[in-house]
């Protein structure tokens, strides 16, 4: 009989703190075993991310998503909204982890041990996997929102403050998914 206990660790990361539009999306992942190629999602091409996301979903012991919508970001601020989204991802896991590691310097309030690791998305495979899943999901959502709100270019810049996005914002004004608490959206509304 095997008496060795397996400690279940969930990695958590977010995507979408900086954009002017769209939700902040988080993922929590518990891996069964290491997956080759995992790293910070920003270091991967879209094709690499998509292929790894498929493998993560197939091979992970468990994964779940969390999010904070634009209204929550504007009401709470991005820091607190991100921590809320992280908590939601962990709470949505079908398996309760023994501990949680989070990319960054802050941890969400959880009823289980949680540790923040700066640059964890490059150092901890579970956080890397969460980074990839969150990035792929948010990018897919922004492509879909581009069809609902044409003219802003969400499919290309994913809501970030690119020159194209800022120009569209000046021309069209903000739409429902713009973060009213963010400059230049707030500046435009106040004029």
UniProtKB/Swiss-Prot annotation:
The gene is rnhB. GO terms for molecular function: manganese ion binding; RNA binding; RNA-DNA hybrid ribonuclease activity. It comes from the Bacteria. One of its GO terms (biological process) is DNA replication, removal of RNA primer. Endonuclease that specifically degrades the RNA of RNA-DNA hybrids. Pfam families: RNase_HII. Transmembrane segments: none annotated. Its cofactor is Mn(2+); Mg(2+). Residues 7-191 form the RNase H type-2 domain. Belongs to the RNase HII family. Manganese or magnesium. Binds 1 divalent metal ion per monomer in the absence of substrate. May bind a second metal ion after substrate binding. One of its GO terms (cellular component) is cytoplasm. It catalyses: Endonucleolytic cleavage to 5'-phosphomonoester. It is found in: Cytoplasm. Keywords: Cytoplasm, Endonuclease, Hydrolase, Manganese, Metal-binding, Nuclease. Gene3D superfamilies: Ribonuclease H-like superfamily/Ribonuclease H. InterPro entries: RNase_HII, RNase_HII/HIII, RNase_HII/HIII_dom, RNaseH-like_sf, RNaseH_sf. A divalent metal cation binds at residues 13-14, 103. This is Ribonuclease HII. PANTHER family: RIBONUCLEASE H2 SUBUNIT A (PTHR10954), RIBONUCLEASE HII (PTHR10954:SF18). NCBIfam families: PRK00015.1-3, PRK00015.1-4. Its EC number is 3.1.26.4. CDD domains: RNase_HII_bacteria_HII_like. The keyword Manganese applies.
